[in-house]
Amino acid sequence: MGEVAATMKIMPEGVDTDLDDLKIRLEAVLPEGASIFGSEIEPVAFGLKALKLVVLVGDLEGGTEPVEEAFAAVPGVESVQVTELGRPV
């Protein structure tokens, strides 16, 4: 099948969540065969910011679901949403 690039929007539990620390904790729970290709912080509203990650997903069974479930279980994560799927460039 090859690699797929999934852009994921991770919403923190609050405005005081350290997004750099959150990114490190998310990297630590990545399933085998997945890797982070890029990241950025996106302002949402009223001081709240989201962490956007581009995750390369290889031939993982279940596609992006194992990554979404792993990210959602990390303390400090309010929600995980896949916003875009495509081939890495």
Curated annotation (Swiss-Prot):
Keyword Protein biosynthesis found: yes
Family: Belongs to the EF-1-beta/EF-1-delta family.
Function: Promotes the exchange of GDP for GTP in EF-1-alpha/GDP, thus allowing the regeneration of EF-1-alpha/GTP that could then be used to form the ternary complex EF-1-alpha/GTP/AAtRNA.
Protein name: Elongation factor 1-beta
Native source species: Methanococcoides burtonii (strain DSM 6242 / NBRC 107633 / OCM 468 / ACE-M)
Record InterPro entries: eEF-1beta-like_sf (IPR036219), EF1B_bsu/dsu_GNE (IPR014038), Transl_elong_EF1B/ribsomal_bS6 (IPR014717), Transl_elong_EF1B_B_arc (IPR004542)
CDD domains documented for this protein: EF1B
GO molecular function, one term: translation elongation factor activity
Alphabetized UniProt keyword annotations: Elongation factor, Protein biosynthesis
Domain of life: Archaea
HAMAP family, per database record: EF1_beta
Alphabetical list of NCBIfam families matching this protein: aEF-1_beta, PRK00435.1
Gene that this sequence comes from: ef1b
